[in-house]
């Protein structure tokens, strides 16, 4: 039970004493009203889809094709471009009509969802159990809850397969690693080798290992979606046709608030993973649309100055910097030739504009002298001046502030927002998990307002 300072407060004809919930717990009204809760869910989905459609059209109306996508404060169009819509070689946007269509479709969908939300909130039955038993439920009905879990898993699995179908059969997806600087490509041979796909999960998250954030080719990304989509669909079928085993019945708390806590915990974890993925990965999040990663901007600057000074006659292989280490090139701890200077800390960076210049032992001196292409120079110069950093001084060798006035990288935005949201979801998970466990144990921890020590203390004034 939540505890108010004023236990007699009545809001909307409901008080804390008779309902067990304080006035701010608005959703508590719907705990046992499955029809009204359905209305709230559908209306919430409508609001989400409306935002997506409206923001999509807002970004389309402000989009300037001549400027890089990451320079325009866009967070939705890069996702659509990554799916291969309206994109040409090198990540150039050649058609914005698919983006307009996406926005309109989302707006139309939001209207349908909004109507459904209003209907079920105001007109439809308060509870579904009597009229529509298939859609009705009781929170403690363990079998029904796992059925609902199953339906959710199947929908998630189909969502994963949608990406697979788009990549393999419906025009392909944008691949930043395509020769010549990236292009839309049909993925004809996705990775289905379980050792490769699940190998990412057992990799270290540190350094160049990078856990799942280290995925660096579209074949593995699409193959991973084949695996996850198939497993989720099979898991969904399993949960629909089976009942929870005895150990699961004992281990879990079976209440609405417990399910809320499980969901918040899962979303929190996904938020943290999305934070790392959008910050570090330049394959699932191509730099042509999202801007360079931090290490990528730093390596770009080292590359740009190497190109400039090499043209001016510098011997980039032997020139020393102020510390006595190589000014342009040096060796990594394991012997590879890497860029020198502050960017040495990012020596394990991999990017499609740099990899053609590598040999069997790191950067290839002969290629650096003879094989650098104009598109690599242009891209490095662009990335150098668009670091996803907000420092007043240099970070990783990149002079951030001078070159980044009024520039916020989509990577900065996505990483920071997902970290903050993931953190808040995680705190919500802890809060609701604690309440659910306490309720299941027969007590809810709170401050006893009648015996609170402060009530007997002398007033401050």
From Swiss-Prot:
Phosphothreonine: residues bearing it: 3
Pfam families assigned: PSII
Modified residues (N-acetylthreonine): 3
Keyword Protein transport on entry: no
Comment on bound cofactor: Binds multiple chlorophylls and provides some of the ligands for the Ca-4Mn-5O cluster of the oxygen-evolving complex. It may also provide a ligand for a Cl- that is required for oxygen evolution. PSII binds additional chlorophylls, carotenoids and specific lipids.
Residues holding [CaMn4O5] cluster: 355
Record's subcellular location: Plastid, Chloroplast thylakoid membrane
Keyword Transmembrane helix: yes
GO molecular function list: chlorophyll binding; electron transporter, transferring electrons within the cyclic electron transport pathway of photosynthesis activity; metal ion binding
Post-translational modification: Phosphorylated in vitro.
Membrane topology, from the record: Multi-pass membrane protein
Propeptide: 1-2
Single GO BP term: photosynthetic electron transport in photosystem II
InterPro entries for the chain: PS_antenna-like, PS_II_antenna-like_sf, PSII_PsbC, PSII_PsbC_sf
Primary role: One of the components of the core complex of photosystem II (PSII). It binds chlorophyll and helps catalyze the primary light-induced photochemical processes of PSII. PSII is a light-driven water:plastoquinone oxidoreductase, using light energy to abstract electrons from H(2)O, generating O(2) and a proton gradient subsequently used for ATP formation.
Subunit text: PSII is composed of 1 copy each of membrane proteins PsbA, PsbB, PsbC, PsbD, PsbE, PsbF, PsbH, PsbI, PsbJ, PsbK, PsbL, PsbM, PsbT, PsbX, PsbY, PsbZ, Psb30/Ycf12, at least 3 peripheral proteins of the oxygen-evolving complex and a large number of cofactors. It forms dimeric complexes.
Family to which the UniProt record says this protein belongs: Belongs to the PsbB/PsbC family. PsbC subfamily.
The protein's name in its UniProt record: Photosystem II CP43 reaction center protein
Gene: psbC
